[in-house]
Amino acid sequence: MATIIQAKDLRAGHTFLYKGSIYQVIENSFNKTAMREGIVKCKVKNLRTGAITVEVLTGEKVEQAIIEKSKMTFSYDDGSGYVFMDNETYEQISIPYNQLSWEKNFIEEGTEVSVMRYDGELMGVSLPDQLVVTIVEAEEAVQGNSVQNATKRAWLASKWEFQVPQFIKSGEKVIINPSNGQYVGRAK
């Protein structure tokens, strides 16, 4: 039996069915005004297409989508998608590029992810809260720039550009938050 949820109860990470599609909540906001129904705005990712949109779900009820997750490791790019290997059965699957539009920026060989399925249909991957990645290129530190929180640009192999502290060099491993792509700290 399907579980029905009030839209105002949706939180980041929840998955639900809406207008024939399966969505995962990235972030949400609920604004309650006097004598009116609250306005629920959710930034959501369509798990079938990878598209990220904002849905206004004021007063709506949605059906919860139960997503099965299995741990897999990224192996290689086969030219049409990314190949992942199941950590227990060693089964390999290829996930098309369009299903990993955001996640592809942070996946390196050996990255462990959770592959998501709904009723056997492949929905994409879920990354851990923090990932260790390798800086392939970093700008030179500016001599004398000792202002608090001085940063410079750095790039991953995927060409993802983000800000890192001045002391980070090319080839170093750092920790990033894949939900926003920002630097968290040095990897140990």
Curated annotation (Swiss-Prot):
Biological process according to GO: peptide biosynthetic process
GO CC aspect terms: cytoplasm
Any one GO molecular-function label of the UniProt entry: translation elongation factor activity
Annotated Gene3D superfamilies: 2.30.30.30, Nucleic acid-binding proteins
Main location: cytoplasm
Record flagged with keyword Cytoplasm: yes
Pathway recorded for this protein: Protein biosynthesis; polypeptide chain elongation
Keywords: Cytoplasm, Elongation factor, Protein biosynthesis
Keyword Cytoplasm listed: yes
Pfam family name, one: EFP_N
UniProt subcellular location: Cytoplasm
SMART domains the UniProt entry points to: EFP (SM01185), Elong-fact-P_C (SM00841)
Family to which the UniProt record says this protein belongs: Belongs to the elongation factor P family.
Described purpose of this protein according to its UniProt entry: Involved in peptide bond synthesis. Stimulates efficient translation and peptide-bond synthesis on native or reconstituted 70S ribosomes in vitro. Probably functions indirectly by altering the affinity of the ribosome for aminoacyl-tRNA, thus increasing their reactivity as acceptors for peptidyl transferase.
PANTHER family: ELONGATION FACTOR P (PTHR30053), ELONGATION FACTOR P (EF-P) FAMILY PROTEIN (PTHR30053:SF12)
Protein name per UniProt: Elongation factor P
Organism: Ureaplasma urealyticum serovar 10 (strain ATCC 33699 / Western)
